[in-house]
Regions:
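Short, charged, low-complexity amphipathic alpha-helix
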Residues: 1-23
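Serine/threonine-rich low-complexity intrinsically disordered regions
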Residues: 8, 13-16, 38, 89, ...
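Anionic-ligand-binding alpha/beta catalytic cores of soluble enzymes and soluble regulatory domains
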Residues: 17, 27, 31
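Phosphate-interacting basic helix/loop segments used at nucleotide- and nucleic-acid interfaces
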Residues: 30-46
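Short linear sequence elements within intrinsically disordered, low-complexity coil regions
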Residues: 35, 42, 63-66, 113
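Domain-scale macromolecular recognition modules
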Residues: 45-108
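Short acidic DE-rich linear segments
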Residues: 108-114
Length: 114
């Protein structure tokens, strides 16, 4: 009878390592997807009086009353609290380009705790 202890130990160790990596990748993708959804929900629910154009860059601000406004005016040209810069993709999704001093956790809570 062959001693298969080394084969079994090495095999299960390799499986655990690969599955742990796969789960970490799934978790990272899940968090990124939730954040992407939250940003789009925030931008689409903000106030704006124009139809955003695919490929253009826009700026999200927060008023003192807590409401959000989407604008074509850059942060160095306006007085409102700058939240983020977004760009509208061909899928009509707002892609986050940069974020101001307000963190995602402040805006949406902590998705890592999900």
């Amino acid at each position: 009878p062959n001693d298969l202890t080394n084969f079994k130990t090495t095999g299960i160790s390799r499986v655990e390592k690969e599955l742990r990596l796969k789960l970490e990748n799934i978790k990272t993708e899940y968090i990124e997807t939730i954040n992407h959804y939250n940003w789009n929900k925030l931008v689409y629910s903000s106030e704006y009086a124009f139809e955003p154009v695919i490929g253009n860059t826009y700026y999200l601000y927060r008023r003192s009353n807590g409401t959000h406004i989407l604008s074509m005016i850059s942060p160095d040209e306006w007085y409102l609290e700058y939240i983020a810069t977004v760009k509208l993709s061909v899928e009509k999704q707002f892609e986050l380009q940069s974020i101001g001093a307000t963190s995602e956790a402040e805006l949406f809570g902590n998705p890592n705790g999900v």
